[in-house]
């Protein structure tokens, strides 16, 4: 079930370095929110903080609240592994397990959870591959290695793997940056379909992509190198691209910098 995300006064640090300052935003269920901004502005850092994935970096810490349907994911006794199961992540480059079969790639997370029933695993594999618009392309070669698929197919396989564990939210960190235009279009169409069932947050350097797929867009920027990134503005995507409220947003969208 898609869930709402509320971020309040979020500050992110890596050791003494203040990476992101004072971010507050809301992501509604069954919607797509895009984060845009120049390199190094903190948008991917914020994305990873939404499921505590940034904690794999030594000395990472946060201040503030990230709430999923009202429950702080940084609260006491909250298991980060459980958070990442509920809030899935799709990375910049497709990362299937290359020697593992297509079927086993999809159900790898379920196996880690202790699911062993073959009929259940097969059912989830088919449902997830259908959900990722990949089933018809691979149904006759499910036992072949996932690494043998094209780049676009591998990314959809990774999306199938993410949704197989029934998350409420999908985070996507530049999911099309390594793909050709045709594969990119397939992923964008898939994102539009997936938002019927999931809350989606995507980081993209492609502003046209943000305009095409998202319902709201947040623009991140930083004052100077070494300064923390900040959320400058977040609003309906149509408004951000047609009538932004901040000059910095307009300058970035119009290509004056970035």
Curated annotation (Swiss-Prot):
UniProt keywords (A-Z) are: ATP-binding, Cell membrane, Membrane, Nucleotide-binding, Phosphate transport, Translocase, Transport
Report the Gene3D superfamilies cross-referenced here.
Answer: P-loop containing nucleotide triphosphate hydrolases
How this chain sits in the membrane, per its record, is:
Peripheral membrane protein
Give all residue intervals belonging to the ABC transporter domain.
5-247
Annotated GO molecular function terms are: ATP binding; ATP hydrolysis activity; ATPase-coupled phosphate ion transmembrane transporter activity
Nucleotide-binding among the record's keywords?
yes
* Catalytic activity, reaction form: phosphate(out) + ATP + H2O = ADP + 2 phosphate(in) + H(+)
Q: Which parts of the sequence bind ATP?
A: 37-44
Question: InterPro entries in the record, alphabetically?
Answer: AAA+_ATPase, ABC_transporter-like_ATP-bd, ABC_transporter-like_CS, P-loop_NTPase, PstB-like
Its Gene Ontology biological processes?
phosphate ion transmembrane transport
Keyword Nucleotide-binding attached: yes
- State its Enzyme Commission number(s): 7.3.2.1
Instruction: Spell out the subcellular localization from the entry.
Output: Cell membrane
Pfam families found in the cross-reference section = ABC_tran
Q: Which protein family is it in? A: Belongs to the ABC transporter superfamily. Phosphate importer (TC 3.A.1.7) family.
Q: What's its job?
A: Part of the ABC transporter complex PstSACB involved in phosphate import. Responsible for energy coupling to the transport system.
Extract the PANTHER family matched here. Answer: ABC TRANSPORTER I FAMILY MEMBER 17
Q: What is this protein called?
A: Phosphate import ATP-binding protein PstB
Name the gene for this chain. pstB
